[in-house]
Design a protein with these regions (language model features):
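Active-site nucleotide/adenylate-binding loops and adjacent lid/helix of ATP-dependent enzymes
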Residues: 2-182
Length: 182
């Protein structure tokens, strides 16, 4: 199988990311894995989604660090691929990490994923569902039994009162964003 992985940027992927592990496992099982950065995708005039993608030549890796080094280095393959030729496209980018830096990249994986679906590519992590889950309100759609007691507000006095009610131990998250940013 040919599997594409849309990531924020190949240069910022690390050897501990799940995407790197999945791509390496695919290669070790005899599949082709292509990493595609958000800025590497194009929608061509002939209605095909294409991408500047990177893959590896070797077929067996013991460490994700070596896999990633070879993918990025001179031993790695860089080709402009037609996304329609992939068997599966996995959307693995993190739109929240692009906010304020590369705002154009926030929705690009989702948009290109939608275009690939229209061309018959199996897209894992449904682009429409990902778009719905762009902020923490999405979690409120889950059953009450599987989510923590939640307050969503910008009012600091309400946050302080909620913290007191919870015994002073709460987790504060931005509505949209990650890592305390948003």
């Amino acid at each position: 199988m040919k599997v594409g992985f849309v990531v924020n940027d190949i240069a910022t992927e690390t050897d501990v990311y799940t995407t790197t592990r999945i791509a390496m496992a695919a290669v070790n099982r005899g599949h082709e894995a292509w990493l595609i950065g958000a800025g590497d995708m194009a929608f061509d005039p002939d209605d095909h989604v294409r991408a500047r993608a990177r893959s590896v030549s070797k077929k067996n890796y013991k460490s994700t660090k070596t896999f990633l080094q070879e993918l990025r280095g001179p031993k790695g393959r860089s080709e402009r691929i037609t996304v329609d030729d992939l068997d599966v496209l996995m959307l693995r980018s993190d739109p929240a990490s692009e906010k304020g830096k590369r705002d154009w990249a926030q929705m690009s994986g989702i948009d290109f994923g939608r275009a690939a679906m229209r061309r018959g590519v199996i897209v894992v992590n449904d682009p429409d569902r990902l778009a719905q889950a762009m902020h923490k309100m999405y979690c409120q759609l889950f059953p009450e039994e599987v989510r923590p007691k939640t307050l969503i507000t910008r009012d600091t006095s309400e946050i302080k009162a909620f913290a007191r009610e919870q015994g002073g131990k709460i987790v504060i998250k931005p509505l949209q964003g990650s890592g305390g940013q948003g």
